[in-house]
Each structure stands twice: as structure tokens, then as C-alpha cells.
Amino acid sequence: MLSTSTFLALAMQCAASVHPDTTHEVARVESGFNPYAIAEIIPKAKRKPGDKGVVSYFPESKEAALKIVKNIELRNHRYSVGLMQITSTNFAKFGTTAEKMFDPCENLKVSEKILVDCYKRGGDLVRGLSCYYSGNPETGVKPEPEFNNTSYVQRIGFSPPDNKKSFI
């Protein structure tokens, strides 16, 4: 795990157009600051009743993380990796790979592109964070039973939307 000071220094260097507090809170929720964190996304058809639909892995090395990714890919499941949990479906769009996404700076660079794009499309930070989470500005503000009826943006640290503008 990265220390707060190391993470913030990397965030300011590698994702300078996003406020370091924003990247810090996203990384806290997404990976717990573990650069090798992996979330395997279980297809809905394969989920058991009550499952969250995600299996989390927290390997301690890049080599161990790459082995887990290889096994997930053999199952043809989507997954997210690294500090900011970049989803495998974004790799081609951003010209990257799972291996590159285990590099904290590279992961932050891609997350910056996604966050800025989502912020522009959503019009404010809350909707932008929802988009970062789900690809749209609505899903991430809805309470989720599997997360104690909190929304993604609440887990990041925002109250439910109150129509005030927030900035990236």
C-alpha cells in the first residue's frame, strides 16, 4: 500500500489536472491505496443471490497480480486494476494493458483522462464521479443495497446530490 504522502506526490505529478483530494478519495474507495488491487466483475448470469457481483483481490506483488489477471481473462470476465481501478474495457481506448495499470503513475494518468472526461460530460464533480464509477452520471448517486444503501459518491465522501455545483 502506498502512504498518503507518496500517493499525493504521485497524484500531483501524474494526474495534475485533478485535485489531489479527489484522486485520494477515489483511490481510498477503489483500492485502499493498493497499486495491485484487482476487482473481478462477475457477469450477472453467473452471480448467486445476494452476491455483490465483484470479487476483490489484494496481491502483494505485480507478479502475483498478473497471475490473477491471467486467470480472470481465461474466464472471460471483466476486471478493474490498480490504485484507481481502471476497468479492462478501457484498456484499448487508452492504449494500455493490465500490466501497465499496475504502475501507479500510469494508472493515475489514465484515471485523470477518465475523470476529466466524466467531469466535462456530467457538468459537476458528483455527476463526474458517478460517471467514473459506472460510465454514466446517474448510477453512482443511487444507493446500493450491497454497500449498506450508500451510493458511490457517498462512499467517496459526498452527501446525496443537492444540485450544488462541485468542481474537479
Write out the residue ranges for each language-model feature.
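Non-catalytic cell-wall polysaccharide-engagement segments
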Residues: 1-22, 32-34, 55-168
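Early exported N-terminus immediately downstream of N-terminal targeting peptides
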Residues: 23, 38-53
